[in-house]
């Protein structure tokens, strides 16, 4: 028996309600899908995936299915309820509450979120399931600050796929766009069985990296540009040519262009233009070091086979563990040195006054700060 309380999310195919379950004696989420909005095959696929993920040993960071019902008009999936909603809305609130002079009171444990998200993805892949729609809107947050990966409606029980229009455009891997595969795949009456396959796990790795970028900066790496002939990621060619210069232009330069000049200390200007306050990422240098790790391990363009979530996790663990075991002042200076070395881009697309060579690098050890 369920008592619907209120709608908490409405999408193209389904509406999700918060409800009280007398059977489970807890709040639950009812995902109600009208039968005319989806096929029986699609719903069966989602049900089968959720049944596997919600087996006798469900993963703590995956939103489990508690029950399932159907009648003449609707499919009703009973899911775990997460009190704090999704990360997209949560960060939107944090962004509106915070500013350089009055930072947000909401703090998010970035290290925990990354590890839990990677653990959930790895668990699903170990069961032969790829999510195919990883994004902040599908990451739910509990009252304890833990995450649960949700909405497995696009999931597939296969490491390979030739579906090129699955997922959310801003987070989709480049190989899943029609503009980056053979145009013959999209001709009318084309036999999809002969279309080239992409690796669904490696596509998930890309989406993971794009999602973490959004969590750090509140802005997607790319936006999608569409036309009748081609669909592609806007500015993607710039990223493919030089990802570090692209990230510098997109995320660093805007934070330097708000009234700062050549003489302004880059260290100060970056620190004062932080967008979010992370519990375990106390400064912008940690954030941009994480950017480099993601580019090196997750956001590979030309060869998706080089993407590795295992390498990403190992490098992140190494960076955090190294910092925690070192003297804080020495560690902080190392991070500044690393930032200067990695992000000293010199490209004509970056105005000269925003290039690192025109800023004085802080020397905390020498100055005794």
Swiss-Prot record:
PROSITE patterns: PROTEIN_KINASE_DOM, PROTEIN_KINASE_ST
Alphabetized InterPro entries for the sequence: Kinase-like_dom_sf, Prot_kinase_dom, Ser/Thr_kinase_AS
This protein's name: Probable serine/threonine-protein kinase FMP48
Matches recorded under SMART domains: S_TKc (SM00220)
Subcellular location: Mitochondrion
Keywords for this protein: ATP-binding, Kinase, Mitochondrion, Nucleotide-binding, Serine/threonine-protein kinase, Transferase
Main location: mitochondrion
Additional record remark: Present with 339 molecules/cell in log phase SD medium.
Main EC class the enzyme belongs to: transferase
SUPFAM superfamilies reported in the protein's UniProt record: Protein kinase-like (PK-like)
Catalyzed reactions: L-seryl-[protein] + ATP = O-phospho-L-seryl-[protein] + ADP + H(+); L-threonyl-[protein] + ATP = O-phospho-L-threonyl-[protein] + ADP + H(+)
Binding site for ATP: 8-16, 31
Disulfide-bonded cysteines: none
Active site, UniProt feature: 133
Induction or repression: By treatment with 8-methoxypsoralen and UVA irradiation.
EC number: 2.7.11.1
Lineage start: Eukaryota, Fungi, Dikarya, Ascomycota, Saccharomycotina
Gene Ontology cellular component annotations, sorted alphabetically: mitochondrion
Keyword check for Membrane: no
GO MF term set: ATP binding; protein kinase activity; protein serine kinase activity; protein serine/threonine kinase activity
Domain (Protein kinase): residue spans on this chain: 2-369
Homology family: Belongs to the protein kinase superfamily. Ser/Thr protein kinase family.
């Amino acid at each position: 028996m369920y008592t619907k309380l209120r709608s908490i999310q409405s999408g193209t195919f389904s509406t999700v309600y918060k409800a009280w379950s007398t059977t489970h004696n807890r709040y639950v989420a009812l995902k109600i899908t009208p039968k005319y909005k989806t096929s029986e095959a699609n719903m069966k696929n989602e049900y089968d995936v959720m049944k596997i993920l919600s087996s006798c040993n469900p993963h703590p960071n995956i939103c489990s299915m508690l029950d399932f019902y159907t009648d003449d008009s609707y499919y009703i999936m009973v899911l775990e309820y997460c009190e704090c909603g999704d990360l997209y809305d949560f960060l939107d609130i944090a962004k509106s509450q915070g500013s350089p002079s009055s930072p947000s009171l909401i703090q998010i444990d970035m290290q925990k979120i990354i590890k839990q998200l990677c653990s959930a993805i790895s668990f699903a892949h170990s069961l032969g399931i790829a999510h195919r729609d990883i994004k902040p809107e599908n990451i739910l947050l509990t009252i304890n600050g833990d995450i649960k990966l949700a909405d497995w409606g696009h999931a597939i029980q296969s490491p390979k796929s030739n579906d090129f229009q699955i997922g959310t455009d801003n987070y989709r891997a480049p190989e899943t766009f029609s503009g980056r595969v053979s145009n013959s795949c999209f001709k009318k009456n084309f036999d999809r069985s002969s279309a080239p396959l992409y690796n669904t796990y490696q596509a998930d790795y890309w989406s993971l990296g794009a999602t973490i970028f959004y969590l750090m900066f509140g802005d997607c790496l790319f936006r999608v540009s569409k036309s009748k002939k081609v669909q592609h990621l806007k500015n993607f060619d710039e990223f493919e040519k030089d990802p570090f210069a692209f990230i510098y232009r997109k995320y660093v330069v805007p934070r330097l262009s708000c009234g700062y000049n050549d003489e302004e200390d880059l260290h100060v200007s970056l620190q004062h233009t932080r967008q979010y306050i992370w519990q375990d990422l106390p400064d912008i240098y940690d954030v941009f070091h994480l950017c480099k790790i993601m580019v090196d391990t997750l956001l590979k363009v030309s060869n998706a086979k080089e993407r590795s979530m295992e390498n990403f996790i190992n490098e992140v663990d190494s960076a955090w563990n190294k910092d925690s075991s070192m003297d804080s002042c020495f560690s902080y200076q190392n991070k500044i040195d690393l930032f200067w070395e990695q992000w000293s881009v010199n490209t004509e697309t970056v105005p000269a006054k925003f290039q690192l060579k025109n800023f004085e690098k802080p020397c905390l050890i020498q100055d005794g700060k």
